[in-house]
Amino acid sequence: MERQLNMQQQEVTHEFFMPLLIPSVTHQEKQVHVVKGKPMFYEPAELKAARTKYMDNLAQHLPDKKFNGKVRLMIKWLFPIKGKHVNGEYKDTKPDLDNSVKLLQDCMTKLGFWKDDRFVVSLITEKFWSDVPGIYINIEEVE
């Protein structure tokens, strides 16, 4: 169920799960070259590939209508289990959440999940080890 309307509170939510191996590259990894004394920023190939992967997966889950008001964005990053870790255990290794969120949120904004990313007034994000790797996303209108 990707979209539901709570008739009591008139809150709109949109939730989905993208089964995928989460790229290890983050938005923080943009590169800079100085050309004629001016810094020129660019995305290395690995970052472009990660952006494309997110865009392709997110495009399959676009809401029927873009969110135009304040939203709470919840993201759960589920990484494949390595070593002695168990399903559902918090992951305390790289990548850093803040850098991972930036790339994903930029892709969601570009695809039109919401009118502007300034409307994301609440952000809840966690990362876990999981038997099923991927990204769970829940977007909820708030007042």
Language model: regions and residue ranges:
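Acidic, proline/glycine-enriched N-terminal capping motif
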Residues: 1-143
